[in-house]
Every structure is written in C-alpha cells, then in structure tokens.
Amino acid sequence: MCIRDSWEIAGLLSPEPLPTFPNGFPKEVLDEFTARTGYQVLCNKPYSGTEVIKDYGEEHMKTGALIVYTSADSVFQIAANEAIVPVEKLYEICAEARRMLVGKYGVGRVIARPFVGDCAANFTRTPRRHDFSLVPPADTMLDVLQQAGKSTIGVGKIHDIFAGKGVSETIRTSGNTEGLKVTMELADRDFDGLAFVNLVDFDMLYGHRRDVAGYAAAAAEFNDWLPTFMDKMRPDDILMVTADHGCDPSYTKTTDHTREYVPFLIYGKNLRHGVDLGTRYCFGTIANTVCDALDVKACLAGCSVWNEIKA
C-alpha cells in the first residue's frame, strides 16, 4: 500500500515525492523521538517487517527499546511485542511520532507493528497494525463528493490512507475475506455516493512476503466472489477494479513494490462493454471518472473516461 499512489487514485498529485530514508533516520530524528517518548531505538534501517522482529525482537524484549525501521516507501515503522508494550501504548507512541515527523521528515505513514511470541522462532505480527498518515495537502475526490452531499464510505484502510479526510463512514476490516463480505453487503444498501474498498492482503500478506501460492489463492477468492457481486449490482451501479502499485509475489530480488502497470477495469450493467481504455498517464483518471459518473463537478488531476464508457 502506497499513500502517494492512493492519493493519486483520488485525484491528488503530490507536488514532491514524500521523503524516504534508505540509510535510516538521522540522529536528530531519533534523539527527538526518544526525548518525546522515553524509548530508545533498535535497528533504524530499511528492513523486512517479518525479518526485523526475528533479528531484533529478543533484544527488544530484554531492553524495552523499540524496533524502528523503514522500507523503500515513505514510512516510519515501530514494532513492539504486545507483552512489553501494550498495543494502546504503542498507538500513543506512534501518534506522538506522527506529530513529530513533519516538514522534511514528514513521512507518508507512521505504522504501529505489534507482534507476539517469546523468542525469534515464534515471533508473529498481529492484525492490530495501525497507520498514522499525513493529512492529504489538498482536496481529493472524497472531499469533492462529500461536499456535494454524496456518501463516501471507506472500507479497510481507506480511512487511514486519507487520515479520515473526506471519509463520511469508516468500516474497518481484518483482511480480504471480510472486505469482500462488507462490499457485498454494501451492494444491498441504498446510498448515493462511493464505497472505496482496499483489499490489503494482496499487498501485505502475499505481495511483500513473496507468497505466490497465497496470492493465487487470494486472487481465486476474488474471482469466485466477483460474479455474485456483478449479478447483485443494480442497473446504475458501477464497479471499478484497480491497484495503487504492483507487488509481484514472484519477484525475488527485493520484497518492495514492483513497477508493472496496474489494471483499470470498469463494469456496469448500463455501461458500454468491451471498450479499450488504453494506457492512462495518471491514476487520477479514476477520480475524475467517479465524479463524472456521480454527476459531480471536480477539478482533480487526470482525465475522465466517462464519455468513452457511458451508454
């Protein structure tokens, strides 16, 4: 999951790249973090999330120091064993780090990474991860739709990605299976607006972990779910399927995101079928198309394809 790409899907192009720290965070950042939270720091490198708790988890449990690490993304991640730092305390620490990390150190996300276990052999991350994101610096399609009186329902981590900005209703989910269940239930609801859903398991559990079999099973689950959802859709409902980046589970040189083109699939019973939309230059195409479909005027990055697909 990449915050900047998700913002672009919503029609906001970040004018500058969010900062990354391939050599770890500067001493002044860590000193300020310790002064604010009272905790020392271990690691301070780009690291795989599962490997970092294996390599530093036992030292963390002995010393109480927090495991701070980053990745190729603009993130400040804090891992702590739930037996050493209760989850609510970890959230407080992350919230303080979020307040601290601004300006040139304004990472896209501060991420709480709780884990359990008593030794390196059995350390396991728990589902209680929580993201503390930068507030988008300008309006996105969520704000535009909300201001027009439309519902904006965020499912999964959408609230976290946009720091709640423009989200009128939040439904948190534990993974793909629950996300698909919630989306199916939303098809039965009578609302006028957007349900924005992210299925984070493709990224977090299978893409980054390079789990080809797990990714295939998740894709099969979605494929099995899709026909039932399409049958349930009302005549004026529209489904869009896309991604904010690649995360090829078969690419083994790194565990970071990969750079293939992402899909942009649109379906609606009252839309034209079989239209080739070509290769678009900007994810903001999605935001503008959503706004056009809902008859809401918007001035967002990208160009709508609504005129190409409407019947």
Say what each PLM segment does:
Residues 1-311:
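Feature captures the catalytic ectodomains and active-site-proximal regions of enzymes
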